[in-house]
């Protein structure tokens, strides 16, 4: 087949009629001799080959290649659509997870914020209690110190008064009075 078409095509590249003498290469303006030579060459090289069969086979092959290409394209298109749907599904899933993480994150942040605020309030309350306890302790200590100081001063004042007022006669009278009290107590018990 290739030889026949190559031979036929090569005839179109031969020099024009004037160069070979009797052989005219212009197929459209040829005479009967040239046509018979061309037909002879075609018949000789194309034995057992039907031109319409060759053309039909060529067209069938071309049709099959086109159909195969279309089929492959449809398969690729179907695969691409399937992958696109899978990607869209994954995208929706990831978007939902992102929204859920965002919502959970916000609620977690709010929960942590509330926990922190509560913890700070508790700490402040404890500090306030410690402050009040410290103030009460210091007040009580100060009151005790003042009492002790007042008691010491009163005791010193009383001792000073006693020492200035005491003499031997007062001592003897106090001792006699105490002995009398003890004696009367002893009589009552007997």
UniProtKB/Swiss-Prot annotation:
Cellular component (GO) terms are: chloroplast thylakoid membrane; proton-transporting ATP synthase complex
Tell me a Gene Ontology molecular-function term this record carries.
proton-transporting ATP synthase activity, rotational mechanism
Please report the record's description of how this protein sits within the membrane: Single-pass membrane protein
Q: Does the keyword Phosphoprotein apply?
A: no
**Annotated compartments:** Plastid, Chloroplast thylakoid membrane
Transmembrane annotation, as ranges: 35-55
- Keywords attached to this entry: ATP synthesis, CF(0), Chloroplast, Hydrogen ion transport, Ion transport, Membrane, Plastid, Thylakoid, Transmembrane, Transmembrane helix, Transport
Q: Which CDD domains does this one have?
A: ATP-synt_Fo_b
PANTHER family in the record: ATP SYNTHASE SUBUNIT B, CHLOROPLASTIC
Remarks, anything else? In plastids the F-type ATPase is also known as CF(1)CF(0).
| Its job | F(1)F(0) ATP synthase produces ATP from ADP in the presence of a proton or sodium gradient. F-type ATPases consist of two structural domains, F(1) containing the extramembraneous catalytic core and F(0) containing the membrane proton channel, linked together by a central stalk and a peripheral stalk. During catalysis, ATP synthesis in the catalytic domain of F(1) is coupled via a rotary mechanism of the central stalk subunits to proton translocation. Component of the F(0) channel, it forms part of the peripheral stalk, linking F(1) to F(0).
Subunit composition and interactions: F-type ATPases have 2 components, F(1) - the catalytic core - and F(0) - the membrane proton channel. F(1) has five subunits: alpha(3), beta(3), gamma(1), delta(1), epsilon(1). F(0) has four main subunits: a(1), b(1), b'(1) and c(10-14). The alpha and beta chains form an alternating ring which encloses part of the gamma chain. F(1) is attached to F(0) by a central stalk formed by the gamma and epsilon chains, while a peripheral stalk is formed by the delta, b and b' chains.
The record's comment on protein family reads: Belongs to the ATPase B chain family.
Name recorded for this polypeptide:
ATP synthase subunit b, chloroplastic
């Amino acid at each position: 087949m290739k030889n026949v078409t190559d031979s036929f095509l090569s005839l179109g590249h031969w020099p024009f009629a004037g160069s070979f003498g009797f052989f005219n290469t212009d197929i459209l303006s040829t005479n009967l001799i040239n046509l018979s030579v061309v037909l002879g060459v075609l018949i000789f090289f194309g034995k057992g080959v039907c031109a319409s069969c060759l053309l039909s086979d060529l067209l069938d092959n071309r049709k099959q290649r086109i159909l195969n290409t279309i089929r492959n394209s449809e398969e690729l298109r179907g695969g691409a659509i399937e992958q696109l749907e899978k990607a869209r599904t994954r995208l929706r899933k990831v978007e939902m997870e992102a929204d859920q993480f965002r919502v959970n994150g916000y609620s977690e942040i709010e929960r942590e914020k509330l926990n922190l605020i509560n913890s700070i309030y508790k700490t402040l309350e404890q500090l306030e209690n410690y402050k009040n306890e410290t103030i009460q302790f210091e007040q009580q200590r100060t009151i005790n110190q003042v009492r002790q100081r007042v008691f010491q001063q009163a005791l010193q004042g009383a001792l000073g008064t006693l020492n200035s007022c005491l003499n031997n006669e007062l001592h003897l009278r106090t001792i006699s009075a105490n002995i009398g009290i003890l004696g009367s107590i002893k009589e009552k018990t007997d």
